């Protein structure tokens, strides 16, 4: 039910708190923290979960945190414009499944790990940078940096991840995909991603 202006004026503090909470829920750090919360919960339950169960639990959090359609286009690079719409859609679908499968395969156990998320993202002309760390049980820290983009009408979403703080996952994918596209076209890339996704599921 709509809230009247008079009601908001009579109770400005609760309205202000509600607005602040709503904005905070869509902040870059909140998006990453929610993703990590889901990921950590899956890791803790992993011994009792099949690959498919881990996939199903992770999929909503990943599709919410990651802009997978844009990541697909950026990973393919200039060749994207030469693809037919049906090929673009199919590649987006399989790239999304592949990305989720990587997480479902990789995070299949829990050994006391935890995640830290810096509270203040860093703005740059191309988006927002959120720095995080995976802290292993022995104290070793692995830096994971998320490059996020804010599009109108939605919360910020990840478009690239820098492993160990320096290795761009997007650049790695683009380098690999460009050779496959040159040799086998869209069908060759589709087959590569389908084969890798299947291997992650059974591996």
Residue spans for each PLM region:
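N-terminal secretory signal peptides and thylakoid transit peptides that target proteins
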Residues: 1-14
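Sec/Tat signal peptide C-region and signal peptidase I cleavage site
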Residues: 20-24
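Early exported N-terminus immediately downstream of N-terminal targeting peptides
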Residues: 27-103
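Surface-exposed, polar/charged faces of alpha-helical domains
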Residues: 45-49, 82-86, 112, 187, ...
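Solvent-exposed loop/turn segments at secondary-structure junctions
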Residues: 80, 97-98, 136, 164-168
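Surface-exposed, charged secondary-structure patches
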Residues: 100-142, 193-196, 200-203
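Short beta-strand edge/turn micro-motifs at domain boundaries
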Residues: 143, 147-172
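Low-complexity, intrinsically disordered terminal/linker segments enriched in charged
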Residues: 162-203
């Amino acid at each position: 039910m709509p809230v009247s202006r008079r009601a908001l004026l009579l109770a400005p503090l609760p309205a202000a708190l509600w607005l602040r909470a709503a904005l905070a829920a869509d902040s870059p750090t909140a998006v990453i923290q929610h993703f990590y919360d889901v990921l950590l919960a899956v890791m803790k339950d992993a011994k009792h979960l099949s690959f498919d169960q881990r996939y199903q639990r992770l999929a909503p959090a990943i599709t919410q945190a990651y802009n997978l359609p844009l990541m697909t286009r950026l990973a393919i690079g200039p060749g994207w414009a030469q693809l037919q719409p049906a090929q673009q859609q199919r590649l987006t679908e399989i790239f999304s499944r592949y990305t989720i499968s990587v997480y479902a395969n990789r995070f299949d156990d829990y050994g006391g790990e935890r995640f830290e998320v810096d509270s203040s993202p860093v703005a740059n002309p191309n988006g927002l940078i959120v720095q995080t760390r995976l802290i292993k049980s022995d104290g070793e820290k692995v830096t994971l940096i998320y490059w996020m983009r804010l599009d109108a009408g939605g919360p910020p979403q990840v478009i690239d991840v820098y492993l160990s703080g320096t290795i761009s996952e997007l650049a790695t994918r683009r380098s690999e995909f460009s050779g496959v596209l040159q040799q086998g076209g869209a069908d060759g890339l589709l087959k590569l991603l389908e084969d890798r996704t299947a291997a992650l599921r059974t591996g």
